[in-house]
Amino acid sequence: MKDLLKFLKAQTKTEEFDAIKIALASPDMIRSWSFGEVKKPETINYRTFKPERDGLFCARIFGPVKDYECLCGKYKRLKHRGVICEKCGVEVTQTKVRRERMGHIELASPTAHIWFLKSLPSRIGLLLDMPLRDIERVLYFESYVVIEGGMTNLERQQILTEEQYLDALEEFGDEFDAKMGAEAIQALLKSMDLEQECEQLREELNETNSETKRKKLTKRIKLLEAFVQSGNKPEWMILTVLPVLPPDLRPLVPLDGGRFATSDLNDLYRRVINRNNRLKRLLDLAAPDIIVRNEKRMLQEAVDALLDNGRRGRAITGSNKRPLKSLADMIKGKQGRFRQNLLGKRVDYSGRSVITVGPYLRLHQCGLPKKMALELFKPFIYGKLELRGLATTIKAAKKMVEREXAVVWDILDEVIREHPVLLNRAPTLHRLGIQAFEPVLIEGKAIQLHPLVCAAYNADFDGDQMAVHVPLTLEAQLEARALMMSTNNILSPANGEPIIVPSQDVVLGLYYMTRDCVNAKGEGMVLTGPKEAERLYRSGLASLHARVKVRITEYEKDANGELXAKTSLXDTTVGRAILWMIVPKGLPYTIVNQALGKKAISKMLNTCYRILGLKPTVIFADQIMYTGFAYAARSGASVGIDDMVIPEKKHEIISEAEAEVAEIQEQFQSGLVTAGERYNKVIDIWAAANDRVSKAMMDNLQTETVINRDGQEEKQVSFNSIYMMADSGARGSAAQIRQLAGMRGLMAKPDGSIIETPITANFREGLNVLQYFISTHGARKGLADTALKTANSGYLTRRLVDVAQDLVVTEDDCGTHEGIMMTPVIEGGDVKEPLRDRVLGRVTAEDVLKPGTADILVPRNTLLHEQWCDLLEENSVDAVKVRSVVSCDTDFGVCAHCYGRDLARGHIINKGEAIGVIAAQSIGEPGTQLTMRTFHIGGAASRAAAESSIQVKNKGSIKLSNVKSVVNSSGKLVITSRNTELKLIDEFGRTKESYKVPYGAVLAKGDGEQVAGGETVANWDPHTMPVITEVSGFVRFTDMIDGQTITRQTDELTGLSSLVVLDSAERTAGGKDLRPALKIVDAQGNDVLIPGTDMPAQYFLPGKAIVQLEDGVQISSGDTLARIPQESGGTKDITGGLPRVADLFEARRPKEPAILAEISGIVSFGKETKGKRRLVITPVDGSDPYEEMIPKWRQLNVFEGERVERGDVISDGPEAPHDILRLRGVHAVTRYIVNEVQDVYRLQGVKINDKHIEVIVRQMLRKATIVNAGSSDFLEGEQVEYSRVKIANRELEANGKVGATYSRDLLGITKASLATESFISAASFQETTRVLTEAAVAGKRDELRGLKENVIVGRLIPAGTGYAYHQDRMRRRAAGEAPAAPQVTAEDASASLAELLNAGLGGSDNE
């Protein structure tokens, strides 16, 4: 017995490991894995079904087919364990060794491994520095390659055709050595001296100047060094021995009817063995060269197909014309080993069923059908029955449960009590898609779900199904209860707002309950308290909506956190007083003293959580729900067709619009407007008409006139059911009501363009055939879009998770002083997001000072919670520098201070939290709500773009930033800088509005002046760009020669003449090199200098510029010298929605990106080429000027002689994130990506916290390119993990050496995932072959840092509750202790023993 226990212990031991290394296998290594050579292609004997000897399933090589039994049956039973049968040669052992024992095939001729040959860049090609085409010609026996030139004029690695080879043979005899096939390549690889080659290349690298050559050399050096360091030998890329997969991993399964289903691998192996054996025979017979060669080529192709079918030439197909699945196909793709079996395992103990509503459940409960619970909790019931002595054996217990005896139900009740179960709804888009509940047994067959958690699951009850999982171990139950219980997940991890919010009926009920109504029964009473209000309502003496006075007792927390009561008489309604009874103590009465809509209820729950904490909030949420349901039922709100009131004015509005359209049509026919303008105008007219109709309709629905107590008419908010549903936020929106009772409006074609005839009818009037047909267009597009959107959104989430999966909070504080400035998001006149929303839950990076003083308001390293934010608002701070994950200094991971508050819990984040995955889920989950289409902005929107003035909305004072300006003759400011911003500051010093002011705008008010709301503060001409003079004086033309550089035009209407500068293409030969300009001189004819510089005021004019001055006229500063017409951009497509988010995270370059200044300096233009002009920026300090060629059609924002700063926009367009990173730095690119992504989500009304996007940006900035290696081991131009460079530099600086300089790289998320340090994670993501090839050649080690790698190797993840386990492992490793031996308990031992004996008895026990 003791012996047996020891044996059992040995069976369960797993190796502790820290890292996984991948490398090339040497032939000796393959032989050492192998248990014997497979010599025959046979599989099993068709009569006896026993494996053939030496075949692909041979029992002698791979092990016995039955447990502890040899093939011929001489030795059976456990007692012969380890004996090798002398008759059949099979070792007596467990049959599971057939899953792990490998065989091998000795190849008669070496063959190249296709991965190292064909996976680009070809490793063999790179190593030998030969083109892939040549290597292929050698390998597939079309050409010879010279291996040793000897004394001849043949070079090593020279390719010879058959004829050339024969000629050379005649000429030189056997002085040289040339071969073909894999042997030749093997010989070349073998004879390479890697170290020497490396030295030589490094020397070449230092000498060469050409960029392409440098790149090529660096690539080769990296590969050679990888070989040297990893200990791989180049010749191992050529196979001489082929390993054979264990047979149980490529099984042969008998189907009924005597046929067999086989794995494709067996076919592929059979081909290889057949060809190999044939080749051996041919070599023994010394067959003619050409036959042997053909056989060798066929063997090479067979091995190729086995390793990666279809990579070269046509894929080998099986009997049914389907390509065979090779070894490479087994591991890659969605159905491959990684994604199907390692990352997507199935879970035991689960049931699934349809869900229904459980309106009487508490928040932490779910209803579980009895039948289901009985099945799921079987093991626990068996155990309990035995423990109570109600059943003697498991088998008896099983019988009792099957009989469903009465005692079983009692025991089920006991077992289930306090045992949480997990509920999951697919698709699980974020972590709230799986939550734990305590089961309540119910009759019926459907799971009951608490209505408030539906939002988190995105569940509805139209037939959705959910899965139930039972956590078995104590630890699992603990985690489910402490972390996953629905009551612990009240806030959404994406934005920190409550996600347990009432919706639909509950909202409608509460809204109905808290509305007031004029002259309702009982109006004007004074009540002693909510109890009396309820009594009066129940006894029918007062209406729910009656306006009354009630004595209310509020409780408020004082400084010590004690509750202090305060009683007052409040004007309120009966319904609100009744609702007050369920509000927990500590909240103010004002919270319910209003008509409660969805937003207000959400805010109420949020306030409750922040003030009172978790428990009262959960109880409150449940009470809200019960009350809401009760009063929604009492309200009797229902929808009738008469509720959709069509406004009387609708008819006249539509006829007015039709008249306007007819007028435009006439103008078009008489040629006054173009077709495009007509289309845009028509659409604008209809859009405006639609708005007017819907406004009339909403005004109509919104109010009703009633008689009050004094007999006068009074308007009040209407009790129309449809309006109440929309107003409360329960269901529907103004846009939907507009289609019911207004007009349906303009419809879009499937390509996104708008049909110019709108649907003037609404659903109440009904649609005619044409209108109905137009509607189907849009409806179908909606469905098609949804299907596409789901797939795209899922793929985006997958990429995001993959790039961020290894980011975990690993330390408390990294101590950095870096951070990003947070300012409110202001677009035009609206504050889109106030500062408090942006900084809430972040940690300050430096002290926040009270504006205008040196007093510290908030010290650095403070977590800004609600109270701090109130303080910031009171002092109207408008910029705070906060810590950010992008600037965090932790090496592998992030520190808690840089991340800030854990949004789902409301306190600073814990160590071990997997913030990367949370960020990815938070961004990906709303993905399906984003739109798919690109917006064709025509009509209304493009007109808004051509603004010509700024009109402020609020009163306040003006503040200008980055401004250069001159004062013109009428005393107004004229802007002469490019990126001026105008902000409106209110009396508290808060920024309310912000606008961009273009060059040449005339300001009505100066910096710091007061303005009133609605005042126009700036004007400009949107269609031309002016050239403004900064000095006063007289105009002097230079190089303005009529007919050569300029031409005179006269306007027919006004009779004024103007000069137009010719484009250099249109000029005569003499005018090509002239540069027309306007110079400003004083009365004596001397140059006037631009103030503050020593440059003469001379303005060069680009082509097409229009000058309306004559030579010698007097002008004053701020006047317009010339105008450059701007082509209006036409209707540009604006990528919106999901594709835009994907573009940003993939860091794709836009089509025509903005051109930014690479350095600071003075702009001038050099010699032009045919289609481009040469822009030269000369630095002020006299270093080398920077030149760039810019296509002629790009509009430039800068004039000659202007000063630009690095990163300024030279030509407008969408900015490329890579340029922003290079020229303006990490913080600028973070800000850009965060703001752009937020714009898309904000448009859809989705709230996501900035830090999630920052987390992804941090991962995109993970790599750096070495600019100068210093004393480090890096190569120039090499791309390295940013943290690696930091660590290396730290060590070098500690030793007083020079560190490497580097530039940060921005990689798209796909690129970044594939470029991670972990090859396991990258291989399981995409491009498996390429990743594994690269890793094997470099002999990479995977340190198993991320979550994915650990899941794949089957360990706890180093995050969450697994974080402690990994910390403990690290600590023990550092202390050098052995891991604690797994203790085998008596139960384990007896269980394994029973299993063993059962197996040994040949499975006679068939219960």
Curated annotation (Swiss-Prot):
The keyword Metal-binding applies. Keywords: Acetylation, DNA-directed RNA polymerase, Magnesium, Metal-binding, Nucleotidyltransferase, Transcription, Transferase, Zinc. Its EC number is 2.7.7.6. GO terms for cellular component: DNA-directed RNA polymerase complex. Zn(2+) 2 binds at residues 814, 888, 895, 898. One of its GO terms (biological process) is DNA-templated transcription. Zn(2+) 1 binds at residues 70, 72, 85, 88. One of its GO terms (molecular function) is DNA-directed RNA polymerase activity. This is DNA-directed RNA polymerase subunit beta'. It comes from Escherichia coli O6:H1 (strain CFT073 / ATCC 700928 / UPEC).
